[in-house]
């Protein structure tokens, strides 16, 4: 399934059907109806979950944010641009596309 499943061990099927889609999250990230904070919290939760599930043997890191890191707002703005340019992921779980974006933006070993 999606990158999220591989990283976090989620199952497919009904569980995936309950996840927020990328296009749904984009509405929050664009600040529609004053919901930008929802985007910030969701994105931070996905990243924090990624950080605590790292294991060198079974789940090696693939996102390496170099310091000084950009602001959360800057990263969200870049994520919105990325998601709008990658509409093939619009119906995919938002957590998956956040991780895809971060892996491309902050690759390890570069």
Q: What is each of the regions a protein language model found here?
A:
Residues 4, 11-13:
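N-terminal signal peptide c-region/cleavage motif recognized by signal peptidases
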Residues 81-110:
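Short, compact, well-ordered microdomains
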Residues 19-81, 101:
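Short N-proximal segments of mature Sec-exported proteins
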């Amino acid at each position: 399934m999606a990158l999220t499943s591989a990283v976090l061990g989620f199952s497919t099927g009904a569980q995936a059907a309950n996840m927020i889609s990328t296009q749904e999250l984009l509405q929050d990230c664009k600040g529609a109806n004053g919901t930008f904070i929802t985007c910030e919290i969701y994105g931070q939760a996905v990243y924090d979950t990624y950080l605590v599930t790292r294991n060198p043997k079974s789940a090696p890191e693939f996102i390496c944010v170099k310091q000084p890191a950009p602001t959360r707002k800057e990263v969200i703005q870049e994520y919105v641009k990325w998601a709008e340019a990658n509409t093939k992921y619009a119906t995919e779980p938002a957590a998956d596309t956040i991780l895809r974006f971060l892996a491309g933006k902050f690759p390890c070993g570069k």
